[in-house]
């Protein structure tokens, strides 16, 4: 039986405000956005209510400059699962985005999520594009990655220097910022900025060549016992040097003393070499999932 809900949509002052307002309905995955306080976006919620009871919640951010809305949390209470509340929330947010002249909506989700089949069904009904795989996410024990003999990789390739990410100078950081403004490929890779709250400084590193930052590995502390590696990047011209393995090895070795039990990291689906390396060496893998992206182009001239 379908549950008819009243959908309320509105802008919110901040993501922390949303988390405080709906502490049991915002999914844990939004935590990485809490560490990005300088994001030039607006936050919006779509809330499903029946009388005074909150049945479901979608949280999204808007980038009006790019005409984009990205959903970062979508939750329906278990009692209303399969009763149409999730689709009502999504349809309501689509109409609101059209009214705001937003041209594209986007969402990323893992195939290991219990909600994945339901979400996929709703996307088809709402006319969203077929999901595209982005990265494979792996969860392994910290001891597993520490005990892989990284010591033999610690001899640094000639001309390279590994530094703590927090040691990136203001001049180096300004160069990265400038490149980020003008290089679309670089924008996709450079996900974390120096000085950003929440970066796990003990294992986040930069790679320098002649004082130029040419690579980095960035991690965030999700829980006291869990670290997630969000970004690993080395300039294409430097990869043949073995710098990628060097960065990973240095970071994993520094997990000692952090009280971290497990780590999560991700590998792009097209990176066959790294995928083979991970699946061959990182055993046992505690869990694995594929992160997919789906989107919908909105007709901004109409609703419905």
Predicted regions and their residues:
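C-terminal "cap" of GNAT-fold acetyltransferases
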Residues: 135-168, 284-304
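A conserved beta-strand-loop-helix scaffold within acyl/acetyltransferase catalytic domains
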Residues: 29-46, 50, 55-68, 74, ...
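Short amphipathic alpha-helix that is part of the acyltransferase structural core
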Residues: 1-40, 49, 149-188
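Conserved GNAT acetyl-CoA-binding A-motif
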Residues: 97-112, 255-267
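Conserved acetyl-CoA-binding loop-helix of GNAT-fold acetyltransferases
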Residues: 76, 82-99, 234, 240-253, ...
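C-terminal structured domain segments across diverse proteins
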Residues: 239-304
